[in-house]
Regions:
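Positively charged n-region of N-terminal signal peptides that target proteins for export
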Residues: 1-5
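Glycine-rich nucleophile elbow surrounding the catalytic serine of serine-hydrolase chemistry
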Residues: 150-155
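Short cysteine clusters
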Residues: 146
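Cys-dependent protein tyrosine phosphatase-like superfamily
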Residues: 23-142, 156-209
Length: 209
């Protein structure tokens, strides 16, 4: 019998997690811990993604904006859920096709979680919970994307930390994709990963303010 990578176990454990109680929208659900996560494999982006793309294990893709071709290829590779972190303005201004409609036409689940680090689209524990739920409910592989995989890397790191991966290991995994300690802060002068978790990470670099 073929042994599935660690991330497959991660998805099963997420599916078994207890749902958040009513009124807990601003709290993330604590799920069963996982022991390890595969190192990201950087993918060729030519004609497929904007800027950056990586596969983590066999079941997770963390990327920049995918093209129509990329979405069709991901469907063929077993992706069943697409999670988009870009805002409506970004999608309207910069994407020459209707992503939601294409994803639906391909028979995949579309999960829209726009984040930008402002009052309208904050980095929040609620987004982390919804992403974890999307992973847990996925019937196949998952694509998590934003514009250049920066926001997606922060959410991915928060997800790993919430699942029990040590902070330094989770940050290293996400940095290998496109997490950067730069000036684009979330609320309270924190990095997005910290706002997704609603806690400070002392080992995370913070640029001078």
């Amino acid at each position: 019998m073929k042994t599935r990578p660690a991330f497959s176990t991660l998805m099963v454990l997420t599916a078994l997690a207890v749902a958040s109680p009513p009124g807990a929208a601003q709290q993330f659900t604590r799920r069963a811990p996982i022991a390890t996560v595969s190192a990201p494999v950087i993918l060729d982006t030519a004609g497929l993604y904007l800027e950056r793309a990586a596969r983590v294990g066999e079941d997770m893709f963390v990327t920049g904006q995918p093209t129509e071709r990329a979405l069709r290829e991901l469907k063929a590779q077993g992706v069943t859920t697409v999670v988009n972190l870009r805002t409506p303005e970004e999608m309207t201004r910069n994407v020459p096709f209707d992503e939601a409609a294409l994803v639906a036409s391909l028979g995949m689940q579309y999960v829209y979680l726009p984040v930008r680090g402002n009052d309208q689209f904050p980095y929040s524990p609620a987004t982390l919970t919804k992403f974890a739920d999307a992973v847990g409910n996925a019937k196949g592989k998952v694509l998590l994307h934003c514009t250049v995989a920066w926001r997606a890397s922060h959410l991915w790191a928060a997800y790993l930390i919430n699942r029990g991966i040590p902070v330094d290991s989770a940050l290293a995994n996400a940095r290998a994709i496109n997490l950067m300690d730069d000036h684009r802060m979330g609320s309270n002068g924190r990095q997005p990963v910290e706002d997704f978790l609603d806690k400070a990470l002392p080992t995370l670099g913070h640029p001078p303010r």
